[in-house]
């Protein structure tokens, strides 16, 4: 038999694929919820790609209350780098949407396109990874500013030593544990 070629689908995964067949037990409402969530993730990815390109090109946006415009304009204004991987080990790394470290001030900003309220925890981990990778003591920073841009609002947080040091300690501990386990 000569099978049909679907070149446009190679490397893609169907929203309701055979390998993730739990959808067989979905009612109509759940199926639509799952599909809409998948579409929102695709949209979020495209918005992140657009924001990165816009920031990298330095294309300021109109001053509006739209989250995306504020995120882009702030990143350009602070001369932030986009999509920076912060690496401690093969077990612990992550990609910060935008980041800058200048004059002993660390800024990490994150764009969230979902409807559910985002947690600052992810950005706290980025701070810990930054400190570990660049061998900077958090207590020595003049300031650390974290921002989440979501739903036409901005949440800003200035973490404390008491928040960051336990995360650093946990990363170091778990990395040693995982490395030792791998060597056995």
Which ranges hold each PLM region?
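Low-complexity, intrinsically disordered/propeptide-like segments
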Residues: 12, 19, 144, 149, ...
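Metal-dependent nuclease catalytic cores that hydrolyze phosphodiester bonds in DNA/RNA
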Residues: 1-95
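Accessory terminal regions of nucleic-acid processing enzymes
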Residues: 176-184
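Mg2+/Mn2+-dependent nuclease catalytic core
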Residues: 84-177
